[in-house]
From Swiss-Prot:
Chain spans, region Adenylation (A) domain: 29-360
Modified residues (O-(pantetheine 4'-phosphoryl)serine): S613
Official protein name in the record: Adenylate-forming reductase Nps11
Reductase (R) domain: annotated span: 717-952
Catalytic activity, EC: 1.2.1.-
Length: 1099
């Protein structure tokens, strides 16, 4: 629909070569001064939209030139690299401003590795880099290290407020000083700027762009044909990186030449130069489309496929004049579905080496041909037959279109290696079907090279042939033809499973050498039929494309099955009836199957018998699969009612059988309520049981001094070998006020001594191992849940009479378990309290408990931040995890003990100095690893108050040794939180910087990310859990996703993921560490990533 408010007279700049690129900028400033160039949404502005005119953009570019080269000092032609995270309107003013200054810009991806960037700089003799040092410091440090003695300098990007002083309000009457003009006009053959290739097969390559090349690209079909749409067309380019060829063509050349405006995100750095630009999500892109009345959009397949799942998103897409897809193959199934309901899809094709090659203009009656590319008649193509009706596309140099890279042996031109299929009836239409080198391009844009993996798998003697597939899918699969004599009846599930198991060692070997997104899941092995062998050439080589074609239906069915079903388990027969007694036996057999065939005691918590989150999830899947195989339709219906947490809520086989019996008899019951014990009542009963007989107060005695600087403290530290425990031990051993430390730990199942484990813990975290030789250190092994802590009388009595500080840090870390699974931990806490009460030092003894913020996640957020007080309403913990409930119980036990006790509600502990150590089994590292397999990073609205372990340990000691009596509760969360979005941007940068990815992952809303994860949970295998460990925490991730969806409707920022905000007033009063703690930075993130990589997390 046309915009009636659009009333500009347009004077199109010529693209015949009479004007060069900088002159086109000036032409528009003079002849199209008020025509909108960029538009972005802004509350409070006219119509809610701000427009940057061609005049204002022109002047912004000149202000950049002044800032970079005052008075045009020095010689022309210096190459200036640009690696910056800036707002779009700032980036392009910078890019053009460098040209106007007489320099040659070289925009680079900030997601390149330091080695890749350094190689580009050296190859082009570039000695100067304009950047955003505040957001890219790890990368810049790496570049410095790589360049060594190479003469090089960094310069910050001119701030947005300087180059756009009126930001949307500038007129021709406002003061302005143009940058001094160049003495002579550049020749068309001069290099105007550099771009670089993607680097998918090695380091990115610098690709020069001459003035003539740029003008040819400005006159190319993707740009000029957009003038065929009405003059009020506004193209959404929010998703396009400003350094990328497509971003430059669509966000810069197109509005300059066609005078069609482009919609971008509102700038964030006008008032805060260090603010991170808006991170694209599928949600905020469509929001920008609506708020700026945008009627055309550029997007990548991953986002389009997400929008295809949302009816409301489809309605928005249907209203566009065109939706252009680029950056990877869009699934034809998705594209056809969208086109069938009226979404005006267009495929965009081109490259940095050759520019844009097809028109984005399509008539409405051509929508059904969306997958076919209408190549530009301005470009001279050569089609080289590849057999099977396929052709390689080559672009030949011509007077109307120049390529930037020449690689043909006979004529000037560029061989793309892209393989096309000619439309059977419509002249000029071509379909991109793959690459000459058979690279598989996934829907995320990631590329899988199949040959090495196929060859590895084919080395198994039972394998006769292999062909990988997965183009436009989110993961790959493989066709395997059994060698003659090893035929498989593919209709027999047992034979199929046996064959997969037989070849699995070679598949695992292939997976080890592959990128995360290229790994093959066991369920994605498709075995060929004997009556449909793989097609081969005369030489015996498998014809890859023909093979995928003849198995097209089976491949589609396989993806549908893997993504939508739970594996049926028939190795355990269904019970004869659904009574609790029969179910105890039946569930016991299933439990043994997932527990290495070890018999499980039905009366004992399964998590005390070796189960973890993974085995619990497998047990649930087996239950669902078995129920699904029943001949009783009511039982099959029951399979869909099983709650995700049924095993965690019912952690003994007996309780699980009770819950399952109720589900079968009443499908409305899901098992979510476990045995229907009210959680609050269970929590209060547990508290009553373990606090029985506590004095409440102690008789006053002469207290021993605290905090006087003398070596007077004898400390009992539990759980010293773990993460926080190691930092606590190091801090204690370094502290001059401590005379003796008892490091109390349970004996190890693997037979390693406490000394060995402690040394390993210090080494892993980079702590000073020399401290472990301190004469102040004593190791004790015992079990706090046992009488007298599992110690002999003499050792127990020595502890009782000597210690005056207890730091209780040992605890089971599993957020999936119910309260009853933490009974031994709670009992151990009570035993330690009894130890303290029996001590002659009891009145002055300090008992410090490392609790958790999860003990108060039920706090009423409407009351503000959770205070540093004992919370007597058990509801604050009854609705959360068993882990948090158990910590709450112990906070209350300590409150009733009469001791000088403090419970530290500790928030998320991140990695810390000196190595960035952060356990790869913690939820956030698991999220990061899973994101690689899912092809996206999640963003949540709000802040994170994570803090490093050395800060936690020191804050605890600050309180432990203070002169004043400690308060009963202290909240330890970061007093200066950071935005989740900024943190995730740093994660993305660090993944690329550490060469874990060749290009950045898209960042999507947490809800979308979780949707991908949840789909993977259906029928998840052991390999799925290895690739996506976040599957183990599905309920936790679901909670964050649901909370984030609600939070996005609120304007103010709280804690990301819907977590409670905690007051730190007392913590900062009592601890200098907390008062002076610096926020998390990109440097911290870089340390985490380096540590995770060193632990093999990404292998």
């Amino acid at each position: 629909m046309a915009d009636p408010s659009f009333s500009y007279t347009l004077h199109y700049p010529p693209v015949d070569g009479s004007l060069l690129f900088p002159e086109i900028i000036a032409f528009n400033a003079e002849h199209n001064s008020n025509v909108p160039f960029f538009v972005f949404p802004e509350d409070g502005s006219a119509n809610g939209v701000v427009s940057i005119s061609h005049l204002e953009f022109y002047r912004a570019c000149h202000r950049v030139a002044h800032a970079l080269r005052p008075n045009r000092a020095g010689p022309d032609g210096e190459i200036i690299a640009i690696i910056a995270m800036t707002d779009t309107i700032q980036y392009f003013a910078l890019l053009v401003g460098v040209i106007i200054a007489g320099y040659i810009p070289f925009p680079m991806s900030p997601r390149n590795s330091a080695a890749a960037v350094s190689n580009l700089l050296l190859k082009t003799s570039c000695h100067r880099l304009i950047t955003t040092q505040h957001s890219l410091q790890p990368l810049l440090d790496g570049i410095k290290s790589e360049l060594g003695s190479f003469n090089f300098s960094f310069q910050d990007v001119p701030c947005l407020a300087h180059i756009y002083p009126k930001l949307g309000l500038e007129t021709i009457d406002d003061p302005f000083e143009p940058f001094p003009a160049r003495p002579s006009r550049p020749s068309a053959s001069e290099v105007m700027m550099y771009l670089h290739s993607s680097g998918s097969t090695g380091f990115p390559k610098a690709i020069p762009q001459t003035h003539q090349t740029v003008i040819h690209w400005c006159a190319a079909a993707p740009v000029v044909d957009t003038k065929l749409y009405p003059a009020d067309t506004c193209l959404g380019v929010m998703l396009l990186p400003s350094f990328h060829t497509l971003g430059i063509i669509c966000s810069l050349y197109l509005p300059l030449i066609t005078l069609r405006s482009v919609s971008v995100y509102a700038p964030t750095s006008y008032n805060d130069p260090k603010a991170i630009p808006v991170i694209p999500t599928s949600e905020n892109i469509l929001e920008g489309v609506q708020r700026t009345n945008c009627n055309a959009l550029m997007a990548v397949p991953a986002f389009i496929e997400l929008w295809a799942l949302s009816p409301s998103a489809i309605e928005i897409l249907k209203s566009l004049r065109f939706l252009a897809s680029s950056g990877g193959p869009l699934s034809e199934k998705v594209g056809n579905a969208l086109a069938s309901v009226g979404v005006p899809l267009v495929n965009v094709y081109g490259g940095t080496e050759c520019g844009g090659l097809n028109s984005m203009f399509r008539r409405k009656d051509e929508v059904c041909d969306w997958v076919w590319i209408n190549l530009s008649p301005r470009v001279m193509f050569r089609w080289v037959p590849q057999g099977e009706g396929l052709y390689e596309c080559q672009i030949l140099q011509s007077e109307m279109h120049r390529v930037s890279v020449e690689n043909l042996p006979d004529v000037k031109g560029y061989a793309t290696s892209d393989i096309f299929l000619k439309h059977p009836t419509k002249e000029g239409l071509w379909k991109l079907v793959g690459r000459k080198d058979d690279i598989i391009v996934l829907s995320s844009g990631e590329k899988t090279v199949p040959a090495p993996m196929e060859n590895t798998i084919a080395s198994n003697p039972v394998v006769g042939g292999t062909v990988m597939f997965g183009r436009a899918r989110n993961h790959v699969g493989i066709l395997i033809e059994p060698r003659q004599g090893f035929d498989v009846n593919i209709d027999d599930p047992k034979q199929v499973a046996a064959f997969r198991n037989r070849i699995w060692p070679e598949v695992e070997e292939a997976n080890k050498a592959a990128a995360a997104f290229s790994r093959i899941f066991k369920e994605m092995i498709l075995i060929t039929r004997p009556d449909k062998p793989l097609p081969r050439t005369g030489k015996g080589t498998v014809m890859r494309k023909a093979a995928v074609t003849i198995y097209d239906k089976e491949i589609d069915a396989l993806y549908d099955t893997v993504e939508a079903s739970t594996t049926v388990n028939k190795d355990v027969e269904l019970p004869k009836d659904w009574s609790e007694e029969s179910l105890v036996v039946w569930l016991g057999e299933h439990a043994a199957r997932v527990n290495s065939d070890k018999k499980v005691d039905p009366e004992v918590d399964v998590f005390e018998q070796g189960f973890d989150s993974l085995t619990a999830t497998f047990l649930r899947n087996r239950i669902i699969g078995s129920l699904s195989s029943s001949t009783d339709s009511n039982v099959r219906t029951t399979a869909r009612q099983i709650d995700q947490n049924i095993v965690f809520s019912n952690p003994t086989i007996k309780r699980l059988s009770q819950a399952l019996a109720r589900v079968v008899s009443n499908p409305q019951f899901t098992g979510k309520e476990g045995s229907l014990i009210n959680r609050k009542v269970e929590l209060e009963n547990t508290l009553a049981m373990y606090s029985e007989g506590l004095p409440g107060t102690l008789s006053p005695q002469v207290e021993q001094p605290n905090g006087d600087g003398h070596s007077c403290h004898v400390v009992l530290l539990t759980g010293s070998t773990g993460g926080l425990g190691s930092y606590l031990l190091a801090s204690l051993l370094e502290n001059e006020q401590v005379s003796l430390v008892y490091a109390f730990n349970r004996s190890s199942k693997d037979g390693k001594s406490s000394e060995e484990r402690q040394k390993a813990g210090f080494e892993d975290r980079g702590l000073d191992i020399a401290l472990l030789s301190s004469p102040k250190l004593r190791y004790i092994e015992g079990d706090a849940a046992q009488d007298k802590l599992g110690l002999g009388d003499a050792t127990y009595d020595k502890l009782r009479t000597s210690i005056n500080v207890i730091i209780h840090n040992a605890w089971r870390l599993d957020f999936s378990l119910s309260l009853s699974s933490f009974g031994s931990n709670i009992k151990g806490t009570r035993n330690l309290v009894d130890l303290a009460l029996s001590s002659p030092n009891a009145p002055s003894l300090r008992f410090l408990f490392t609790s958790s913020i999860s003990s108060a996640q039920g706090w009423d957020k409407s009351k503000g931040a959770c205070p540093e007080e004992v919370l007597f309403d058990a509801n604050v913990a009854s609705g959360g995890s068993g882990y948090g409930a158990s910590k709450y119980v112990c906070e209350r036990i300590l409150e009733k003990s009469g001791l000088q006790a403090s419970s530290f509600r500790i928030g998320q502990i991140s990695g810390g100095q000196p190595r960035g150590a952060w356990s790869v089994t913690d939820w956030f590292p698991m999220l990061v690893k899973s994101s690689l397999a899912l092809g996206a990073l999640p963003v949540a609205k709000g802040v994170v108050s994570w803090l490093p372990p050395h800060a936690v340990s020191q804050a605890i000691l600050d309180v432990a040794f203070a002169k004043a009596k400690p308060p009963p509760v202290i909240n330890l969360v970061h007093p200066r939180p950071v935005q989740w979005a900024a943190l995730m941007q740093s994660i993305g940068d660090a993944l690329v910087h550490n060469n874990l990815l060749t290009k950045p992952l898209p960042i999507v809303a947490f809800e979308e990310w979780f949707s991908r994860l949840e789909q993977k949970a259906i029928g998840a295998s052991a390999d799925d859990f290895k690739e996506m460990p976040a599957l183990k925490l599905l309920p936790f991730m679901r909670m964050i996703a649901q909370s984030d969806k609600s939070i996005r409707k609120v304007t103010s920022d709280g804690e990301a993921g819907g977590f409670v905000v905690f007051s730190t007033t007392k913590a900062q009063q009592l601890s200098r560490t907390m008062r002076e703690l610096a926020p998390i930075t990109a440097e911290d993130v870089a340390l985490w990533m380096k540590y995770w990589a060193s632990k093999g997390m990404f292998m």
